[in-house]
Amino acid sequence: DSSYYNTGEIVLMKKLPYRIVRNGKGDTRSIVKKTNIMGFTCLEQDCIYTDFPESVQEGDIIEFGNVGGYSIVSKPPFIQPNCKILSITPEGDLVEIKRQETYEDIFQTFNFNL
């Protein structure tokens, strides 16, 4: 789950590099070809990739590259918690550099006892 705000404004300027992790449920009825990849917000500009050229199905994971640090501060702090952030070490290992947020993380700054 992601949105335009997780990838940043670069998605409006160029096609991001991507990798698909095939995890589909094997239901060929759910295969989608040549589609727009939309984010989870209700905003019409929340388009991560226009005319995605490959077939994907429910359960597949699309990993977008070339996404920088501004993407973690641009996302609105509602609708859905931020995803975790991974970094690739020089040795090629994945390291979690920021854990996934929870709804508790989002709401802990609010005072609901008014």
What are these regions (language model features)?
Residues 1-114:
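Charged (often Lys/Glu-rich) extended helix/loop segments that serve as interaction or gating elements
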